[in-house]
């Protein structure tokens, strides 16, 4: 499940799981991700999620939205991208579907074809 890790000056403030098709980000208290700082607009940006695609859209904010240090209006997000709003950094993390490396598979005799002559 995609998630956002919000930090300032290297200190993590919060972690938010993205569970909705539309997640709002801004200074106002009704946003899904609230960043209470004057450098962040009341309705700063929105994160759209559809299937396996996630994108961020700037909502005409005063100070802009940056992805990997580049000003964007609308941008697809990739695992590890850094979003900047004001002095805040938001790390976007998205685990690949179906990768359950922590699970052990047990094969019984006859389940795997024999190799060799």
State where each predicted segment sits.
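Regulatory inter-domain linker segments that are low-complexity and enriched
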Residues: 1-3, 88-117
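Forkhead-associated
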Residues: 3-8, 12-87
């Amino acid at each position: 499940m995609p998630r956002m890790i919000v930090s300032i000056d290297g200190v993590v403030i919060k972690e938010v799981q993205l569970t909705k098709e539309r997640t709002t980000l801004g200074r106002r208290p009704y946003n899904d991700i609230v960043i209470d700082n004057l450098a962040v607009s009341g309705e700063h940006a929105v994160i759209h999620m559809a299937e396996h695609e996630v994108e961020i859209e700037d909502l005409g904010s005063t100070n802009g939205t940056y992805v990997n240090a580049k000003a964007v209006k609308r941008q697809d997000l990739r695992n590890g991208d850094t979003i900047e709003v004001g002095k805040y950094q938001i790390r976007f993390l998205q685990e690949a579907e179906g990768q359950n490396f922590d699970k052990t598979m047990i094969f019984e005799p006859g389940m795997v074809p024999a190799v060799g002559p």
